[in-house]
Regions:
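Conserved N-terminal beta1-alpha1 strand-loop-helix module at the mouth
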Residues: 1-67, 90, 152-154
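Hydrophobic faces of well-ordered beta-strands that scaffold small-molecule active sites
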Residues: 4-13, 25-28, 68-72, 96-98, ...
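Structural alpha-beta junctions
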Residues: 5, 64, 90-95, 132-134, ...
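Catalytic cores of alpha/beta
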Residues: 14-22, 79-90, 144-154, 189-214
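Glycine-rich phosphate-binding active-site loops on the catalytic face of alpha/beta enzymes
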Residues: 24-39, 91-106, 154-171, 207-226
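Alpha-helix-loop-beta-strand connector modules within alpha/beta enzyme cores
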Residues: 40-70, 112-142, 172-201
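Hydrophobic alpha-helical segments and helix pairs
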Residues: 65-109
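Histidine/lysine/aspartate-rich catalytic loop segments that bind and position anionic ligands
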Residues: 99-169
Length: 226
């Protein structure tokens, strides 16, 4: 059950799904919305699937409702950012978020990706370019350091994600509590709407503890992950 004063939002795979959930907030990410959440968090920051192509096709089939966040992969080796943003804008996309993101990754995996150019800063650069092009932007964050970087950009909203799950229940609880605290800090410091990704692996620790006013980003029925 969502905390009193919090609001439901939805991760969706099509603009039609976003329309069906309207006026609730939605994040449109066709590829990640259909994957297991544990796989998608790690794999979708890599060009293993055409994240941006599926987003472009979804917007072409039906423009997403105004206010829907369109999840753009910043680390797309096959498209120029400017061309992609222009294409999305022409298809009725008005709001961009760096999703999927390397933000929740850590340790050796994060270090290897950063060495290959898959950096959080690159995602912030994408958002900066999108905002210069007239888009509203939202920034995904997982740590306080990332929140500071995101706030310097001045996004229209912050999306807090709990990161990768673990089999250790105590560690999941610690991460869940840290995520709630980060959402509260983002809300206080940004002065803008904050969304919290309710990753199924952390639902037991996040449900009922979300700060009032935060949008809880849930998985739409029929979708298994993000």
């Amino acid at each position: 059950m969502v905390s009193p004063g919090a609001h439901d939002g939805w991760l969706v795979g099509s603009s039609a799904d976003a329309v069906a959930h309207s006026p609730a907030p939605c994040l449109l990410s066709p590829l990640t919305a259909g994957l297991d959440p544990h796989l998608a968090t790690m794999a979708c920051v890599l060009p293993v699937g055409d994240v941006n192509g599926s987003l472009r096709d979804a917007a072409a089939a039906q423009p997403p409702p105004d206010g829907t966040l369109a999840g753009v992969l910043a680390h797309d080796p096959f498209r120029r950012t400017g061309d992609l943003l222009a294409e999305l804008g022409a298809r009725g996309v008005h709001s961009i978020v760096n999703w999927p993101s390397v933000a929740p990754l850590s340790g050796e995996l994060a270090a290897a990706l950063e060495h290959s150019g898959f950096t959080y800063q690159r995602e912030i650069d994408l958002l900066r370019e999108a905002r210069a092009g007239g888009f509203r932007v939202a920034a995904v964050v997982h740590t306080r350091d990332q929140l500071q970087v995101a706030l310097e950009l001045g996004p229209d909203r912050i999306v807090v994600t709990p990161g990768l799950t673990t089999a250790d229940a105590r560690e999941r609880r610690r991460q869940g509590e840290a995520t709630t605290a980060l959402a509260r800090s983002a809300q206080q410091r940004s002065g803008n709407p904050v969304w919290l990704h309710l990753h199924p692996g952390f639902a037991e620790w996040l449900e009922g503890s979300v700060p009032a006013g935060v949008v809880v980003l849930r998985h739409a029925a029929g979708s298994s992950g993000a």
